[in-house]
Amino acid sequence: MLPDMSDPARNTEIGTVVRRHAPPKRQKNAKIRPREYLTEAEIDRLMKAARKRGRWGYRNATMILVAFRHGLRVGELVSLRWDQVDFATAHLHVNRLKRGRESQHPLSGPELRALRQLKREQTQGSRFVFLSERGSPLTPRGFAQMLSRSALSIDFPFPVHPHMLRHACGFKLANDGHDTRALQDYLGHRQIQHTVRYTEMAAARFNGFWAD
């Protein structure tokens, strides 16, 4: 049964989770980092580092995986509920913030396995997927700190922030040659110009220009 995201009470609760303990403002500065997205190889490294960080390592790695695969904003990630995860049909109901478009995303094998294990290990009986030590939803700031510490633990070459995972999703799918309109719907953009920035930088669109 898919959740009713038109319920004002539900949306109010989600908004409360997102606003509480917001992550620090990220700095967009070429002196701090060379780009605002991560590669798949870099995300794999971060997941491995996050998995090693104490008893919450499995949760941490799963959060990175889900955020990347579905292009989630940090607020969308920490607000994720179990009733948005349909294990029977292998789908995720993505409730977008910023008046974005809601959509149904397929869940891959690695995601399903990770989420099933996380649900088995979760003893608090919460409706939220990603919990803190106190059993409340992990905050955006908490996720940002975990991601930053994971990067520091492996001497990552530049500081990272959660939105880089969303950008990584956009650039990865654009470089795989997916249709811009489909990518717009997947990322929940209301305006296509926000999606075009990914396709404009996709090297794959120039494949075949030279036949050497």
Identify what each model region corresponds to.
Residues 1-212:
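Conserved catalytic core of the tyrosine transesterase superfamily
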